[in-house]
Amino acid sequence: MGTFFAEVQLASSARPDRRETVKLLVDSGSMYTWVSATVLRDLGVRPTERRRIVTIEGRTTERAAAEILITLEGRALHTLCLFGEPGDLEVLGAYTLEGFGLAIDP
């Protein structure tokens, strides 16, 4: 299976009129959607919690998280998003894919 990207629109749940279009790597191996903290903060998204995660390298770490509004192919939903740090990939994760009723077809 190859890698592919999805173009999505992101917005703060509090400011849905202010949107940013980004391309995210579709990664069903990642539980959560990850987006650059800079992009999220520019949209007015503020962290509401911290999530403990295990990286692909097997390290346990924490990232800030918040609910965002995400639009994919004309459909919108609220989903949990992690604040990516420098070096983190921006990905569309399994939790969000399942929210849209989507899965990767190998």
What are these regions (language model features)?
Residues 1-106:
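Pepsin/retropepsin-fold aspartyl endopeptidases
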